[in-house]
Design a protein with these regions (language model features):
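Catalytic strand-loop segment that frames the active site of acyl-thioester-processing enzymes
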Residues: 1-52
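HotDog/MaoC-like acyl-thioester-processing domains
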Residues: 1-11, 87-131
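Hydrophobic residues in beta-strands and at strand termini
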Residues: 17, 83, 128-130
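A broadly tuned preference for mixed-charge, low-complexity surface segments
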Residues: 34-37, 62-67, 113
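Hydrophobic beta-strand-centered segment that forms part of the acyl-chain substrate-binding groove
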Residues: 44-99
Length: 131
């Protein structure tokens, strides 16, 4: 058990996805939208480059919450997020958060995922059960 008291910060995580991650994620998820895997297409539709899949970043938020329970994904009972911005390959994503509720072995975290000042996911809440 890591963070378990109201106001306590979680360990969080930092990840820098390589330029091939969107291709691997597309293969795993079946989401081959060209804004994720074709740089020329992404630029044609007004993006600066390809963007990461939002659900990939959501997965990082889930991983950060589960890490607080020793890395056991079964401890994550509920996850809710707001997608607020785009994220890009080859730029570090940092997931941070803190405990907002604690009741015995049940803890709720407030989390964000950001690339620098760009909040990619905010107002995320995760319920984790340590029991």
């Amino acid at each position: 058990v890591s963070a378990s008291s109201k106001g306590e910060k979680i360990a969080g995580l930092k990840v820098t996805p390589d330029k091939f991650l969107p291709h691997r994620y597309a293969g795993a998820s079946g989401d081959f939208n060209p804004i994720h895997i074709d740089n020329d297409f992404a630029k044609m539709v007004g993006l600066p480059s390809t963007i990461l899949h939002g659900l990939y970043v959501m997965g990082l938020v889930a991983k950060a919450a589960a890490q607080e329970a020793g890395g056991d994904p079964r401890a994550l009972k509920r996850l809710s997020v707001q997608f607020r911005g785009m994220s890009f390959p080859e730029q570090e994503i940092e997931v941070t958060g803190e405990v907002i509720e604690a009741d015995g072995t049940d803890v709720t975290f407030d989390l964000i995922a950001a690339q620098g000042e760009n909040l990619v996911i905010r107002n995320a809440t995760a319920d984790v059960s340590y029991g």
